[in-house]
Amino acid sequence: MKKTNKGLTYKDAGVDIDAGNSLIEKIKPYIKKTKRPEVIADLGGFGGLFALQSEKYKKPILVSGTDGVGTKLMLAQNLKIHGTIGIDLVAMCVNDVLVQGAEPLFFLDYFACGKLDISIASNVIEGIAKGCEISGAALIGGETAEMPDMYKNDDYDLAGFCVGIVDQENVITGEDIQIGDTLIGIASSGPHSNGYSLIRKVLEIQNIDDKKNSSVIRDLLAPTKIYVKSVSELMKKIKIKGMAHITGGGITENIPRILNPNLMANINTDTWEMNPIFEWIATHGNISEEEMRKTFNCGIGMVLAIESKDTRETLEILSANGEKAWEIGSIIEGSGGVNYV
């Protein structure tokens, strides 16, 4: 009898198109919850369609941001907690867009893996959709890439992309910041999504198994805070001169990004409550204060520069919108850096 040679298939090479299609069907309910009126196409097209309502703006400016979650992803994968890492991804992007004064409009994600596990992928994307709900951004598309040999079977990586909008006259650049302005710090939920290569080194030194669900690991996996709604409410009543999202580089590197070169941030480190996880990291890793401040947010996820007369009202508005916030310093004459007192 003559043998029939069916030949190789894409699935034989490790790429399962049917699994990808099943994933799309599974995540549609999550994505539906993020839909905005401007979204004019369902998931599955070659591109996401979004009708820009430019008539609402005098001179609309689009603001874009893209980011990942760094090696925090490794902790989530090792512990098999996949539901919150998607919130981190959205937060890292929308918070960056927010600091320009923009409203996040839509979000797209990139999910790459060695072998597509529908349960894991849908759990991650459910978290992404949750982050989009919190921030008000529509999840209008994404890419799922199954790449055998590029990644181990259980490994996956994430990237996100966000677009927001702001009227040109309302763009926040930091150009108006002056000597005497007040700096407001808004609390973080933990390390957010930065400094995890150093954190993992501390865990290694302390022989802490990052595959076990300990209180330390849970604290380290707390999702990054999304500041969109609280800060958007604040912007309706208070002129924010500058905003710094405290990410990689910590307080030391991020505040100077919004300052003119003749100004300096004078920060009083006794003014806010530091999350205990940072003291744990510093103590168990024998990490200096200087290194902590230029690596981690140290309890402050967002810094706002405002006129000093608006300090009390700013703190009241942020508190009313569920944020812990403090007056952490002021602007002084200097050379563009941060002075700690």
Give residue spans per PLM region.
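A generic structural signal for residues located within well-ordered alpha-helices
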Residues: 15, 19, 85, 194, ...
